[in-house]
Design a protein with these regions (language model features):
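Regulatory and interdomain segments flanking nucleotide-handling catalytic cores
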Residues: 1-175
Length: 175
């Protein structure tokens, strides 16, 4: 769960969160939004809300992360079923769920930009700090460009990007 200066949402804050979501959805209804636009609103609103409020459970996953992973799995499974001509989603997921879990329905895509440390730290001492920040920013932008290209080529949304940082990224897609 992200660490921030502001505390986790308390019971008194939930009405405020619902109001913020309602205000966003009055401007543009969710069914008219692009997936990435809806994802951004949910990230802004739910990143500091725990996914579980059950007593005795550790609140270590945000509601946003829970929703995002659920969307990645659901969209990947839907695409898999559509591409394999499976029309009875309930039968595939529920009735024959245990049997179908053994199938390779999901594909995890991983990338590692090796050698980035050499690139970042190969600087002269004069102005080194500015160069380090500049090179780090450049690599982050290159990585984001590559991620966006892959997502676009595979017709995936940002929900399918599970993690990116430190020269690595992981995505989920249909197999």
């Amino acid at each position: 769960m992200p660490v921030a200066d502001r505390p986790l949402a308390s019971r008194g804050k939930y009405a405020e969160i619902v109001e913020k979501l309602s205000a966003n959805f009055k401007e543009i209804p969710p069914q008219e939004m692009k997936g990435n636009e809806l994802l951004r609103i949910l990230e802004d609103t739910l990143s500091y809300v725990p996914s579980s409020t059950a007593k005795g459970e550790v609140c270590d996953i945000s509601l946003f992360d829970h929703v995002k992973i659920t969307a990645a799995v659901a969209s990947s499974l839907l695409r898999y079923m559509q591409q394999h001509g499976i029309a009875d989603y309930k039968n595939f997921c529920c009735t024959r769920g245990l049997e179908n879990r053994k199938k390779d329905t999901l594909l995890f895509i991983s990338a590692d930009f090796s050698g980035i440390q050499k690139f970042i730290y190969r600087v002269q001492t004069k102005g080194a700090m500015r160069m380090l920040r500049g090179r780090s920013f450049y690599l982050a932008m290159v990585m984001e460009h590559i991620i966006d290209e892959i997502l676009e080529k595979l017709s995936l949304s940002r929900a399918n990007l599970i993690y990116s940082g430190g020269g690595h990224f992981y995505m989920m897609a249909d197999n």
